[in-house]
Amino acid sequence: MIVDGRVSKIVLASIKNNIYKVFITVNSPIKFIAGQFVMVTINGKKCPFSIANCPTKNHEIELHIGSSNKDCSLDIIEYFVDALVEEVAIELDAPHGNAWLRSESNNPLLLIAGGTGLSYINSILTNCLNRNIPQDIYLYWGVKNSSLLYEDEELLELSLNNKNLHYIPVIEDKSEEWIGKKGTVLDAVMEDFTDLAHFDIYVCGPFMMAKTAKEKLIEEKKAKSEQMFADAFAYV
């Protein structure tokens, strides 16, 4: 489904690391399932972005974008800023992706996010909490350092208000003073679980992280391939 939209707001989620939340109001509601993504036409090229919001808010699309020093990342942010300032319409194509939330399942959930891969996880998490599902939800969010945990306070509050949500942030910088877990997000998962046979597992982050997660969790933690979901798995 192709619709037009307008950038309604851009929020700088992390000043130090240039992480942005982009909100796009669409002319026609987009029907999608939590965990799917949207293609945005940028300078003539279609670029995929995970939809960060819950499907019940289908009149507005939320994207999380990390702006590194790479030219492509900077160009993307510049495009959205220009669209906001100039109030021009942008083209969106959605929904896409097969790593959507299997809401009919009663299995506990393991959500693994790397960096701004949290956007994909956020849509799934919000949907689950809105439906008041009873099963446990384990959210592991891995970043290089704590300054990249741009949704940390919000997730901590959610975990306090929802007893079935277990939020575990993980940082890779072992030199940083940090009370929580250190290392890679996959290391933390491997350390905390012995048997994932009855879990539904959702993964989003760098391609190699997703690839390694699928291999190791199946081989060493009894995870079932048919209960693991990530857009990256289509290329593994």
UniProtKB/Swiss-Prot annotation:
SUPFAM superfamilies: Ferredoxin reductase-like, C-terminal NADP-linked domain, Riboflavin synthase domain-like. It is an enzyme of class 1 (oxidoreductase). It comes from the Bacteria. Pfam families: NAD_binding_1. Its EC number is 1.-.-.-. GO terms for biological process: bioluminescence. The keyword Metal-binding does not apply. Keywords: FAD, Flavoprotein, Luminescence, Oxidoreductase. PROSITE patterns: FAD_FR. Pyridine binds at residues 114-118. Signal peptide: none annotated. Residues 1-102 form the FAD-binding FR-type domain. One of its GO terms (molecular function) is oxidoreductase activity. Probable flavin reductase in the luminescent systems of different marine bacteria. NCBIfam families: PRK08051.1. Belongs to the Fre/LuxG FAD/NAD(P) flavoprotein oxidoreductase family. This is Probable flavin reductase. It comes from Aliivibrio fischeri.
